[in-house]
Amino acid sequence: MQSAEMLLTVPKEYLKAPGGFNPNVTMFFSALSLITLSTCGYWLWSWPDWICFSANVLALHLSGTVIHDASHNSAHSNRTFNAILGHGSALMLGFAFPVFTRVHLQHHAHVNDPENDPDHFVSTGGPLWMIAARFFYHEIFFFKRQLWRKYELLEWFLSRLFVATIVIFACQYGFISYVMNFWFVPALVVGIALGLFFDYLPHRPFQERNRWKNARVYPSTLLNLLILGQNYHLVHHLWPSIPWYKYQPAYYATKPLLDAKDCEQSLGLLQGKNFWSFLYDVFLGIRFHSHSSKSSS
């Protein structure tokens, strides 16, 4: 009887964001601590550059998952604190939280639609080694589609003012090289990782619109820790309110349902032409789209 219920949908206990000091809160404050320590280590304690750089990469990697959960209101049950987590993570990454949220929700509404899925261009608009640069398209998409609500334009302006102020002060007081090498370059590294594991690998070959087939899972306990659950990306698309640390148990709870729906449950990069297609995307990645696409159901 229990398995029959699981074949219908995900169990309810996975759906709601918990309150308290949950993993997203822990990751957020860990990221803040890492950035603070690396900054003090560089300027005050003569830490080696590679330690400061690595600490900032890890901090931004953690922030990338927190902002993602916050955009779905699944970082924390308290909406105000969820927004704080989202805005704080966005500032660490150099993002604007309302842009990330509205554009990301458009991705969920139009997965693999060349015209309306903003992440489709991020994944397929050129070589993978330039995927981080294509995240700037999100800002263009945000304004072109006029996606803002209520005070989100003000929030965008303040976010951009924050970054601009740091850059101006860095130029004025001679620490721009630190900003470039220990903030922007780590953000570039994390941007490549986000583009690869949040956008490219889960949705390739970018053709399916069916909700059960427009993303994939590739189960792995190790990857679940390293890329913070994004190897269960289909689970996230089917039930976006699940926090990242519940993707793996939610996957195993719903695996009979995913099997019945013939969902893609492997990475498939080494299968036949997929490997050569991946190499093409790494170095060139240009695609030509027809006007017809597979409909969702």
Predicted regions: what they are:
Residues 58, 219-230:
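Long helical/loop segments within the catalytic core of UDP-sugar-dependent glycosyltransferases
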Residues 154, 183-185, 207-217:
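Membrane-helix boundary/juxtamembrane motif in polytopic membrane proteins
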Residues 45-89:
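Long, highly hydrophobic alpha-helical transmembrane signal-anchor segments
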Residues 1-59, 90-185, 244-297:
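Non-catalytic, topology-defining segments of multipass membrane proteins
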Residues 75-95, 113-126, 210-223:
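Juxtamembrane helix-capping/reentrant segments at transmembrane boundaries
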Residues 57-67, 96, 100, 185-209:
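Transmembrane alpha-helical segments that form the membrane-embedded catalytic/substrate-channel core
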Residues 63-73, 100-113, 199-205, 226-242:
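Histidine-centered catalytic micro-motifs
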